[in-house]
């Protein structure tokens, strides 16, 4: 009998019934499955839990942050412009309201760089959600990086 209040993370794919010993094994299996479906080769996660996937012009970083229990997908868009920042920030917030689906624009304060990001709990993450997040981050970045650079100038 399973304890419904067991706080242990669940690393399993609901669609296939496959279970995994840890989050990295699960995400590596999802990366391999994604690569096979896309007809390409992708590197598995490195020792730090990172790999990169190219989607159109977007380079999507896949980060397994096991200590925090999350999957973080990040794709660089452009540096924050030196001028017109209020208008730029408003544009990013407006786009993040609906145009980015499950992703959002974010800014890395240390690098002063704009990213498209998606963050999900690792426990209970199934392949379809992984694929959807990867596709969404790639699509949003690919769609908006050139538009925003043209509109606000790339530094």
Describe these PLM feature segments.
Residues 100-135, 139-155:
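Well-ordered alpha/beta subsegment
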Residues 69-70, 81-82, 123-126:
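A short local loop/turn or secondary-structure capping micro-motif enriched for an aromatic residue
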Residues 54-58, 75-79, 118-122:
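Secondary-structure transition/turn motif
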Residues 61-79:
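A short acidic-to-branched-hydrophobic micro-motif
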Residues 26-29, 87, 91, 132-143:
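Long, highly charged amphipathic alpha-helices
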Residues 1-61, 106:
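Charge-rich, low-complexity N-terminal segments
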Residues 74-113:
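Short, internal acidic amphipathic alpha-helical interface segments
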């Amino acid at each position: 009998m399973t304890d419904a209040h067991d706080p242990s993370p669940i690393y399993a794919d609901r669609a296939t019934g496959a279970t995994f010993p840890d989050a990295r094994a699960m995400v590596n299996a999802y990366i391999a499955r994604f690569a096979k479906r896309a007809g390409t080769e992708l590197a598995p996660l490195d020792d730090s839990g990172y790999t990169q996937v190219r989607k159109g012009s977007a380079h999507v970083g896949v980060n397994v942050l096991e200590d925090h229990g999350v999957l973080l997908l990040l794709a660089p868009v452009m540096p924050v412009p030196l001028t017109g920042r209020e208008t730029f920030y408003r544009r990013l917030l407006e786009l993040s309201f609906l145009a980015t689906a499950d992703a959002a624009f974010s800014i890395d304060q240390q690098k002063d760089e704009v990213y498209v990001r998606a963050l999900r709990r690792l426990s209970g993450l199934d392949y379809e959600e992984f694929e959807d997040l990867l596709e969404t981050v790639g699509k949003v970045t690919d769609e908006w990086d050139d538009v925003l650079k043209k509109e606000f100038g790339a530094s």
